[in-house]
Design a protein with these regions (language model features):
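Extended boundary segments
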Residues: 1-44
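Short, compact, well-ordered microdomains
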Residues: 67-102
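Short intrinsically disordered terminal tails
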Residues: 1, 101-105
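Broad hydrophobic/π-residue packing in well-ordered secondary structure
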Residues: 1-8, 49, 84, 91
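Short non-domain terminal segments
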Residues: 17-22, 38, 54, 82-83, ...
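Short, conserved turn/kink motifs that form compact alpha/beta structural patches or helix kinks used as
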Residues: 29-78
């Protein structure tokens, strides 16, 4: 599966949403792509997001070149099916395109 992983940049996190769940994030203005940075882009041996979560939480499984922290709540995984917010339990599909170059509306 080809994926991109985005994580909230600590320098850009003005609303203190790092590691916060989707509902909390929505109550505080929603997911703003401009607060995120790309930490991985590439292919992984996975068919499901849960496997992606396992790979990026198991040091020995992480691909070479991965420069992020372990995959956690508030991270966004983008694949051919869309953008998915890593929530407290599972993933929540984001309804809008996740574009880090675009301001939130």
């Amino acid at each position: 599966m080809k994926i991109k992983i985005y994580q909230i940049s600590t320098e850009k996190d003005k609303r203190n949403l790092l590691f916060m769940g989707f509902e909390f994030t929505q109550r505080h203005g929603g997911v703003d792509p401009t607060e995120y940075e790309l930490v991985f882009e590439g292919e992984v041996e996975a068919k499901h997001l849960e496997t992606v979560f396992y790979i990026f939480n198991t040091y020995s499984e992480m691909p070479a070149g991965y420069r992020g922290r372990s995959l956690s709540v508030s991270d966004v995984v983008v694949n051919e099916d869309g953008a998915f917010f890593c929530d407290s339990f599972g993933f929540t599909k984001l309804l809008e395109e996740f574009d880090v170059g675009k301001e939130a509306t």
